[in-house]
Regions:
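A short, terminal or domain-edge coil/loop segment
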Residues: 29, 50-60, 125-138, 160
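Conserved active-site and cofactor/substrate-binding residues in soluble primary-metabolism enzymes
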Residues: 45, 49, 106-109, 142, ...
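Predominant activation on well-ordered alpha-helical scaffold segments within soluble catalytic domains
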Residues: 55, 109-112, 116, 152-156
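Flexible loop residues that form catalytic
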Residues: 1, 19, 130
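A short, hydrophobic beta-strand-centered structural micro-motif
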Residues: 1-4, 107
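A C-terminal functional module that forms or caps the active site or interfaces directly
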Residues: 82-134
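His/Asp/Glu-rich mid-to-C-terminal helical/loop segments that flank catalytic regions of hydrolases
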Residues: 133-160
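Mid-sequence, gly/pro-rich, charge-dense loop/helix-turn segments that line enzyme active sites
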Residues: 4-99
């Protein structure tokens, strides 16, 4: 699952990665962009063919994923990952540095980096289980199982 970071993202949506970056990588003293690790690109791009296919089948799969997923939206854009949770204490900074970011988790960018190094097509697909922000600890409005079922339905449609 993932935490919603973009102001338009809602609990229950599913996010897919057009690009991925690290929230907590900071080698700016050496000329790198915030979110970029030394020797790596600034962001890792989602595979264009997978994203095109996802645009074709993802929203319909999401609507039919569970009894309550009819109004959920598939959102494609920048996703982030880091070593710590984005909370009320750091959400403003994260949004300032990454204004286009939809969501953040702890694994997706590392997986994208490994896939890029191996030449394997990659796109991250995550169900939004909660929102990052002042009430992040209180606004967990959807069960992890529900968020996972929604993203799984999108991935299965992508692979079919």
């Amino acid at each position: 699952t993932t935490g919603g970071l973009g102001r338009q993202v809602e609990v229950g949506d599913v996010c897919a990665s057009a690009t991925l970056a690290y929230t907590d990588a900071d080698a700016t003293a050496f000329g790198y962009a915030r979110g970029q690790t030394p020797g790596q690109p600034e962001t890792f791009a989602g595979d264009a063919a997978l994203l095109e296919r996802l645009e074709q089948v993802g929203q319909e799969a999401l609507r039919g994923a569970t009894a309550s997923s009819g109004s959920a939206r598939l959102r494609v854009g920048q996703m982030l990952a880091g070593n710590s949770f984005v909370t009320a204490a750091n959400v403003a900074d994260t949004r300032e540095v990454f204004p286009a970011a939809l969501s953040t988790d702890m694994e997706s960018t590392a997986l994208a980096q490994v896939a890029a190094g191996a030449g394997v097509p990659f796109v991250s697909v995550r169900g939004v289980s909660d929102l990052c922000g002042p009430e992040a600890g209180q606004d967990f409005h959807i069960a992890v199982e529900e968020a996972a079922a929604r993203s799984a339905a999108v991935v299965l449609a992508l692979l079919s």
